């Protein structure tokens, strides 16, 4: 979450200390490019967000419109590539539980039922992006996760916020370090105690990265919104 969010955030359940700027020494987190950050409500920046700038369907509308219209031309910006599921373009948006709460409470009963109907319709598909989803809105499959990056220093420094992640295809990439045999994992077996016990060891070197091109994030947008604990 920190890698694709581009920030450590304030999550107490992350392993790294809150003051950390890198998961691995010498490999600092890369901040999100400014052109790929959307702010909920009337906010236009981190420092002018207020508690009422909550996550809503309008936040998703902004992200979809941005994904469909920006890039792909002489500006050198790469347009977000959607996932292609059964011939239909789809995106995935990962929200924090607090953002889900705000979206539910700001959405009319009919709207939320329509979102959930879409999830029910897609349950018959075999593609895993629909498994466990909250629903679908404008081709965006919604999922929640309590590890989505949160903050507590927005606005004047006292607004709790969360960073939803809107993703197309290959929003994150993985690279493996492999031995000469070209395999991603090493596997070794050794008998011990006069062949009464079999010891097995495996190892791999893998890294995850949010792709960028010319300093711009590729295939993902983040949506920052106020997100206070609702209880």
Regions found by a protein language model. Name each.
Residues 77-85:
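Surface-exposed acidic, glycine-flexible loop patches that form ligand/cofactor-binding
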Residues 93:
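Polar-ligand-bearing catalytic/cofactor-coordination segments
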Residues 25-78, 90, 98-231:
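Sequence/fold signature of self-assembling virion shell proteins
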Residues 1-20:
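Short, glycine/acidic-rich hinge or "gate" loops at secondary-structure transitions
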